Each structure stands twice: as structure tokens, then as C-alpha cells.
Amino acid sequence: MRTSDETRKAHASYALYDAGGRVEASGVADAAAGDEAFTVGSVALDWLDADGLRAADHAVTLDRWPSGRLVVSQLGRRFETFAAAVREARDRARVSGFLAHGLDDPLPFTGAVLEPAPVREARLLLYATHLTVVPKEDDPFQVPYGAVAELRPDAARHALALETAGGAIVLGHVARDTDAFHSALRTRRDAQAKRLADLTGETVFADGQGVARSALHRIDELLRAFAAPERAAGLAALLDPADPPEAVRFGFVELLDLDERLAPAARELPEHFASFLLVPVRGRVILEILAGPSAATYVFEGDIEEINRDLQALRFRRRPLALSGKEAELTPSNPYRLALRKLPALQRLRAAIRARLNHGSGWEAALAKALDGPVG
């Protein structure tokens, strides 16, 4: 629940320090924790640049990226409520900055990350598509439901372990809301899986996780059913160079950055869903969105499992991937600057891009050229 406007304001002393500890600005003024920035006196600190937050000794300290800090003090009786409002506003903005928000309002819980260590208090936000964890003294991160292979109750610690390819994430300290949290998380994950099973008649699909041809005997039928006509025409150019062919992956993802849809596939996709193809080719991986949004063809360098995992963690968001070098500069006006400098999946994927090919005349020749030559 968003805190009220009144709790987000306070009269306070402030001092803005540079990296060397020298005061850049100071005074006594009205402070406000806005939706996009913290403001006090002549200072405005965007939440995307507020990399640290500490509330102690009746002062709120915000670390400023790339250097410096803002200290707000003399809050009196307003300290605790104002500090909580600052934290809530910062968390909300940075969840979006880390691309960990959803299309719906989340169901919130208060708990802790027990593993991986160290134990950290955290807000647990359940969206329709994923869980976002917001540790009190760390950066938020998301866990797509499709990445959770198993939900394992830990009765001894009144906790829940989320088994993923990257290891277990154990969440607990939810107190009397433990059963409600476990039930809500399981319900959302199962609902998403059921939607894909009902769509395809297969139980192997998970949101954002491609299924290998070797595990999906109906892959050719499903490709024809869930590719838009203009993408189906290019399937041969995508599949013929596959090496090894059995490692080709097909899957579905529920998108969070919406776009105009292509002509519908032979079998209609649920709202906000896209179908995708991942093709390994001698150390490279082709990504093709077969139906859903308008999207270019990407060629990455790397392992198909790692590329798929990072795309899933990014929820196949195309806009931050498509940024040019100029557009990706970490300027104050760049809405992706926090993700670009601190989100590992996005950093790895951008570093792995070898080609981004728009569909149209010359697409097939450009794809063949992108797949040619040595890797590395």
C-alpha cells in the first residue's frame, strides 16, 4: 500500500556531500519523498540514482550515484514515519528501475530472504507473472514463476524454498501470513502453467523457458500453429543452420513491455503472450519472436541455456536490448540507466549481441552473414 502524501513530507535539516565529504548544499527546508525523486531545498535526488538508504540516529542518509550522499536530519517525532515513507517511495521506483515491476498491482508480504546468505529483511511482492523480492539493504530482484522448478516447504524454518536453475531461494519470516504467502505464490505459478498447458495440450511449458526439440515431439506442429504468417515464412532460414538441431527451443512468454501485435497466429495467443524460438548455431543463438509483439531477430554469442535464462529473467524485454550505444549512455534522462548499470542479465545479454536484424528485404542474407565467421 502506498503511503499517504502527508507522511512523505517533513521539515528537516539537510546536507549534500560530494565524494570527498565537502558540503555541496545545505540548509533547513521542506523535504518530500516523491514518486520519482527525493527533494529538499535546492536538491533533487532521483530514486534511480539513490543507491543506498540508511535510517539511523534520527537521520536518513541516501547514497548518490556515482558519488556523494544526502543526509536529512532533525526530523523529530516524524523520523520513523518519514523514514518508512522514504523507503517505500524509493523501493517502488527502483523496482521499476530494475525492470522488476508488473502490469498488475502486486500482493505484498513482509518477510526475509534466508538463502542465499546473509539473512535480509525483505518485502515480497507477488505479481501475476513473477515474484519481486525487495531486500531492505540490497537491490530488488525478480523470480519469474516459469523459472521456479519446484516449491519446497521448509517446515523447520516456516519458510518456502524456490528451486531454480540458479540455485534455491529460501523465503521466510512471514509470521502469521506464512500460509497465505505460500498459497498465493503457488496459486499464481500453477495458474500460469495451466494457461500454457490448456493452450498447447502439453505440460512441459513454463513461462519464458524454451523447451528443446528433443523433449517436444510436436514442435513442428506447434511452430506452425503459433507463428504469425510473416514469421512462419522465415522458419526454414532460422531452423536450417541449427547445430545441433535437437537443441532448438520453442516456448512462450508473458510480456511486460507491450507493443502492437503482429497478424495473429493460426491459434490465438492469450493476451500479452508471445511465442519464441531459440536456435543454437555453432556458439551463437538466434532469438526470434514468432508471434505477439513487433520484434527484430537477435543473434547472441553464448550458450543457449544461459541466453534463455537471462532472457527469462529480463522477461524478454526488447526495448533495453535495442538501445544503441548512444541511447544506453547513463544520462539523467535515460529511464533504463539503473538496469543498464546494475542488472546482470541485461548487461550480459547486451554484451552478447552480435546482430539485431529488422525483418524485410535482405533479412535472410543478413541472418546468414551474422551466423558466419568464427566465434569470439
Language-model regions: role of each:
Residues 1-16, 49-115, 146-376:
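Acidic, Ser/Thr- and proline-rich intrinsically disordered linker/docking segments
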Residues 12-22, 35, 139:
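Low-complexity, Gly/Pro
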Residues 20-21, 28, 35, 243-245:
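N-terminal targeting and processing segments
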Residues 22-28, 68-71, 121, 140, ...:
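Short, mixed charged/polar active-site loops
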Residues 25-33, 38, 119-132:
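Polybasic phosphoinositide-binding surfaces of eukaryotic membrane-targeting domains
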Residues 32-39, 60, 131-132, 158-160, ...:
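Hydrophobic residues embedded in beta-strands of well-ordered beta-sheets
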Residues 35-45, 129-142:
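Short aromatic-glycine motifs in intrinsically disordered, low-complexity regions
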Residues 120-126, 144-145, 149-153:
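Internal, hydrophobic cores of structured domains that mediate oligomerization or house catalytic pockets
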